Each structure stands twice: as structure tokens, then as C-alpha cells.
A protein has these predicted regions:
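Cap/lid segment of the alpha/beta-hydrolase catalytic domain
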Residues: 129-212, 269-270
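Primarily recognizes the serine-hydrolase "nucleophile elbow" in alpha/beta-hydrolase
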Residues: 216-289
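Alpha/beta-hydrolase-fold serine-hydrolase catalytic core, especially in secreted/extracellular enzymes
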Residues: 27-103, 108-114, 305, 329-473
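Proline/glycine-enriched tight loop/beta-turn segments at coil->beta junctions
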Residues: 112-115, 123-135
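Boundary at the C-terminal end of the N-terminal hydrophobic targeting segment
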Residues: 23-25
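Bacterial N-terminal signal peptides that target proteins for export
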Residues: 2-12
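The feature captures the conserved acid-bearing segment of alpha/beta-hydrolase catalytic domains
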Residues: 266-336
Length: 473
């Protein structure tokens, strides 16, 4: 995986997509992190030299370039050429609300690990015979997991509309934490790789695991006979939006992607390059060989299918002050040039929703988000007319009434608490009901579940890679 790809070598006869005249605005700390002062001054980062427009390339060259970009992203993030065997197992099933079943599931991901998930689906008794259902993957924000309110609210909401919805624990959270807790931040630790490896290596491997987590959730949906392979979407929030934007760029099995609270893939030294989290800074820096990373990622998503980016103008988490509509318009123009304004993919170029005076939140459960998802997925137990008039639930009131946890920082009207989510009468789900594995099995499988177990395997993989690097010198 770490060797130069054949496709990248083929690009030598084009305008050399990887040689783009990049100039880093600020030098990072030795471990790859920006200093606090650099983060504060990051803005949108340094300008990038535009890549050759699609109009300057022959059709064969353009096809090769698209494939090469995808190969390079996978290579940098250690995403294997072939995903692992799914190993899907349903441990048990329960009904969190009438009309919805929830399967407690595990499936395999990268590095021999397992992902615990809750998969929501409509009760078969409500479905017409042989009907095909859309699939939806929810990718959580930083610190959250399948126990988070928006994960299980989304699961019930969209299952009631006729979708199969996968919610899962990111590495280090929920059942992938040694203490089975949420908001642990276990994967936030910066780990310096052995000498001879890039300082970003650990974060690249961590991000690759997160990519395969999401891609295998798609694989799980595709393995279900009732799921329509042409109607699969992935929705990601915050860190999950960062993951989803990259997943959508490399996984063409996905039809639609929705990013809420994110999408600001900017220039060298900008938001993600100066982010303090190894799951974002390191992988984004590793994509510098692409050149205009934001335009390339958005172009690849357009080649795959539709994409919606939802943000609030007052979102300080994602630094929307430096990423106003004009910034998104500019990156959209550059992405369109990379695919060709008249190409079939141009119709899929990302669109945006910007809420005035709103901060960080999961907007795919509000009316605009659900309307867009319905246009892509065609929920069989709902309709455009019903969605337009569906009553809503004010999340701030709902979490109090149902004793659902919401972090204090997000229990604000301009953040998650202020959401008016579609649907009424959905319950809170007790934490114990959202455990995928029986405790005895979780104890037995810890070496395939927890961040600590993954970290041990990854340290060994890095040592081996460093040894091979030394031998080649």
C-alpha cells in the first residue's frame, strides 16, 4: 500500500497533478501539530495553485486522474485495496419504538478489529412484499457514539420512514473503549511514530481505521437483501463530517453524502491543518500531495453522487467566520473546473445550507435535511408532502423530558438543543439497550474492540514499517 501506485506514475504524461506549487504558510511543531498561535491565525490557510482543468485533458487522462486521486487518498490513509471480510453478526434484536426494530450487530473493520453497531430498520409487518429500502450510515462527531442522542434519534426517525440505518461506535468510544464509556477522548492522544516514519503516520493510520469503519457500514447495508444498492447515503457530523467527505471521495458505492458542521477543506496551514486532533490534522496534511485538497475532495464526491453541506454562520467549532458562503463558492468553482462544468458529474457538485446565527448542530434531522435526504433516498414509508407538514420535536425540551444526555456545551439554543427535529413521540433509549454485545462476549473480544487493543497492533505495525524503511536505506 505504501509504494507509489501505477496510476500515479501514469499521470506523469499529464500536467503533473501532484506538483502544484504548494507553500505551507506556517511550519508545524515537530510532532505535526500547529502551535496555539498558529491555530488562532490559521484562517483558510495559504492559497493553492489551481490544478489543470478537466477541459485541458483528454477523456482518458481525466479518467486516469480521477482514479489516481482516489488511489492516493487510500494510500495515504492506509485504506486497503480490498476491504476485509464483513464478519457481520447479529447478537440480538429489540424494538425501541413501535414500527422499528433495532439489531445489535458487530462487523469487521481494518486491522482485525470489530465495530459494535445498532442497526435500525422498519418492522417488516409494515412493508409491502419485496420492497427495496434505502440505507443510511450515521457517522458521529468527536466524542460521541451510537449512544448519542442524534444517533438513536436518527435511527428511529429514518427507520420509521422506511430506511435501514447503521449507527456505530467510533474507535475509543462506547464499546470500543476499555471502560465502555462515551466522550472518553481515548484516540485524541498524540503518538510519535518510530524514527524513519512521517510524524503524521499514527494519525494517518487512525484516520484510515475511521474510513474503513464507515465503508464497512456501507458494506453491511449492501449485504442486506432488502437494501437497494443505488439508494445508500452517509451523513456525518463535525469529525464525522470530515470522515464522510473523504469516504464519499473514495467509496463510489455511496449515492449521497451529507455533511453537517463541516466541509471546510481549506488550504495549507488552514483549519484542518492546524486542528489539535490527530484524527484530522495528520490525515489532512498527508493529503497535501493532491494539491488543491478541498477542490479535489469535492470533485471526487461529485464524480460519485450528490452532496449537501449544512452549516451555521455562527459555528465557532468549524470556524465559519473564515469560511463564509463566498469561500464555499470559490472552492465549488475550482472543483467544477476539475470535473468539467458540462460533465455528467457537474450536476452532483455540492450544495450548501447556511443557517444565520446558528452554531454547531446535526441539521440532517431538521426539515431541510430530511427533505434533501428524501430526494436522494426516496423513503418508502413517507412522502415529500408528509415531510413538508410533519410535526417537529424541539430537542432541548425532548432531552429533558426523556432524560437523554446532552453535553452542556451543546445544550444551547444555537447548537443541538435548538434543533427542531422532524417527528414526535420518539423515546429516549436506555444506555444498556444500546450495548451491542453481551458483557461476557465483550470481555472475550476486547482485543478486537478497544482503542487500547488497536493501539498495540498499530505500534507493532509502525515498528515493522520503520524496520523496513531502515533496511531500504
Amino acid at each position: 500500500m505504501r509504494q507509489s501506485s501505477r496510476l500515479l506514475r501514469l499521470l506523469a504524461f499529464t500536467s503533473s497533478v501532484l506538483a502544484c506549487g504548494l507553500c505551507l504558510a506556517q511550519a508545524p511543531d515537530p510532532d505535526g501539530r500547529a502551535t496555539p498561535a498558529q491555530r488562532a491565525a490559521a484562517g483558510i490557510g495559504a492559497p493553492v495553485q489551481p490544478l489543470p482543468a478537466a477541459s485541458t485533458l483528454a477523456a482518458r487522462e481525466q479518467k486516469t486522474r480521477i482514479a489516481a486521486w482516489r488511489t492516493e487518498v487510500r494510500r495515504q490513509l492506509f485504506v486497503p485495496d480490498h476491504l476485509p471480510a464483513l464478519e457481520a453478526r447479529t447478537w440480538s434484536t429489540f424494538s425501541p419504538t413501535p414500527g422499528v426494530l433495532a439489531d445489535r450487530v458487530t462487523y469487521a473493520t481494518a486491522d482485525g478489529m470489530l465495530v459494535p453497531a445498532i442497526v435500525y430498520r422498519p418492522d417488516p409487518k409494515l412493508l409491502k412484499p419485496h420492497i427495496k429500502l434505502p440505507g443510511l450510515v450515521i457517522v458521529n462527531g468527536h466524542g460521541s457514539d451510537k449512544f448519542g442522542w442524534y444517533a438513536f434519534y436518527s435511527g428511529m426517525l429514518f427507520a420509521k420512514m422506511g430506511a435501514v440505518v447503521v449507527t456505530y461506535d467510533p474507535i475509543g468510544e462506547g464499546e470500543r473503549s476499555a471502560v465502555k464509556a462515551s466522550h472518553t477522548g481515548e484516540h485524541d492522544a498524540w503518538v510519535s511514530p518510530p524514527a524513519g516514519l512521517p510524524r503524521t503516520d499514527w494519525g494517518q493510520r487512525l484516520a484510515g481505521l475511521m474510513q474503513v469503519d464507515a465503508m464497512q457500514a456501507v458494506s453491511y447495508l449492501l449485504a442486506q437483501p432488502e437494501v437497494d444498492a443505488t439508494r445508500i447515503a452517509v451523513a456525518g457530523y463535525s469529525m464525522g463530517g470530515f470522515i464522510t467527505g473523504i469516504t464519499g471521495a473514495i467509496d463510489t458505492r455511496i449515492h449521497a453524502t451529507l455533511l453537517s458542521g463541516g466541509g471546510d477543506y481549506d488550504g495549507p496551514g488552514g483549519y484542518f491543518d492546524s486542528n489539535p486532533l490527530p484524527c484530522q490534522t495528520s490525515p489532512y496534511k498527508s493529503l497535501l500531495p493532491l494539491g488543491d485538497r478541498g477542490a479535489v475532495l469535492y470533485a471526487l464526491n461529485a464524480e460519485r453522487g450528490p452532496m449537501l453541506v449544512m452549516n451555521g454562520s455562527a459555528d465557532t467549532v468549524m470556524d465559519m467566520a473564515h469560511h463564509p458562503p463566498a469561500w464555499f463558492d470559490e472552492v465549488r468553482t475550482r472543483a467544477l473546473a476539475l470535473i468539467g462544468p458540462s460533465s455528467p458529474a457537474a450536476k452532483n457538485i455540492f450544495t450548501t445550507v447556511l443557517y444565520s446565527d446558528i452554531s454547531h448542530r446535526t441539521s440532517w434531522v431538521d426539515r431541510k435535511g430530511v427533505v434533501w435526504l428524501d430526494r436522494q433516498l426516496h423513503f418508502p414509508l413517507s412522502s415529500a408532502e408528509r415531510i413538508a407538514t410533519e410535526p417537529t420535536t424541539h430537542i432541548g425540551d425532548w432531552v429533558k423530558t426523556n432524560h437523554v444526555y446532552l453535553a452542556e456545551a451543546y445544550a444551547r439554543e444555537d447548537r443541538e438543543a435548538g434543533l427542531d427535529a422532524l417527528g414526535t413521540g420518539l423515546p429516549g433509549i436506555p444506555r444498556e439497550d444500546l450495548m451491542a454485545l453481551p458483557d461476557a462476549d465483550w470481555q472475550r473480544l476486547q482485543d478486537r474492540l478497544t482503542y487500547a487493543a488497536w493501539a498495540g497492533k498499530t505500534r507493532a505495525a509502525e515498528q515493522q514499517a520503520a524496520s523496513h524503511s531502515t533496511e531500504r536505506q
